[in-house]
Amino acid sequence: GKNLVLLRIGDSDLVDLVTTLCLYAVEAQKIRRRLLQQDSIPVLQSLLERDDAPEGEEAMELLGFDEDEARQLVKIWPDHTLVRLNEIARHREMFTIDVRRQRQNYSNRRMSLWTSQVADATRHLLGLAPSELPPEVGVHIVSSNTHSVTNCLNPWFRVNGPKIRAWARERDHPDLRVEWNFDDDALYSIARSYFKEEKFAARELEQVGREYGIRRLRDTASTGIEVQLIDLSQLTDAEVDREIGAVGKQNRDIIVNIDYAFGEQAEHIIRNLLMLFGRSVRSVNFLGKAGALLGRRGDVLAPTAFIEQSTELFQPLPEQPKESLQGLRDRLEGNEVHTGPMLTAEGTLLQNRLMLNFYRHIWQTVGIEMEGTHYYRQILESSQLGVVSEEARLRFFYYVSDKPLETKANLSARLEPHEGVPPLYAITRQILSEIVAEGNNGQENA
């Protein structure tokens, strides 16, 4: 038996768990059928009994798998591959799930601890508690990832860009064989490989970031959500990404960048942040990835409303300014920006294609994701209660990572860097350029 700790909230965890078991059962049946059809079970038993049996891909090919299949199986199970296959051959995917909640408030306690850590980090960064921020200090909440926002704002990349490109040329890095619309997109993509090999560079990147007011909270309090705090006043005249624009001398705004939350967890995360920073919140920005019901991978979706799949609750969003959408289109050479309602599902795997067609053609839905409704519900409630200003800007943008309506679509298929990096950084630059411009203009008009 296995004991699992569900760290998120209720249904999202259970849907993920059951979905994973279903996927395992389907794939296990395929493997078992292959072993039976090719009479490979006796060969498998013989290999397990031998002390000198071949291992890895060689053993997989003896069982009848082709070269690509053998490579993938060894990639999944690099150790004891034959033992894992034997378990699949014998097991019949009969699972019993017993869910027992020892604490009704476990997640709430974790969220409270996580929020207190954000408050403490704000104190250390600014010398003020979140409730003590003066009117000229605006807070911009960004839900994205742990790299694109800080990459665009960290001056380390401007100084070390030539060194990274030279390193890539020496190794004939595959990202150099692709044509990029923005050279810095290639730089950020290559940097991931560079940091894996040059460990000192990753430490140097973080150190330079700290010198320019970028702080990372690695302790997630069991929420799985990292946080980065960015004091824009320390980035005055620093060399940030060329497409963002300079941070003005009077800009005192801060950015609270949080890693992706999933499902209902998003509702609790954003509520706690809005309560923490209150009327200081100038904008809430969501940069996510989604499955699209039109277009292609690498496009961008700008929702006009969210539809909650479980209740079919329809929640219209404030209209995005035309300048924002046009700015995104200008940054997305070769890809499109699609507007329309988006479906918030409890899980994006094992979706019913017939129902997705229903949402596409009846509701004119452009995409499917997992957090939008939960985020927006709390933002709307906080605005109506006066916790945050009604003037706070909302920005929701998603880049397309998969196409669930395509017959041969594979939700687990990895986005190649040249597919995923350009839309990710196009959205990041658009959001950051607007945040920086608002902070600059706000202080000039103060």
Model-derived features: where do they sit?
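Accessory terminal and edge-of-domain segments that mediate assembly/interaction
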Residues: 1-446
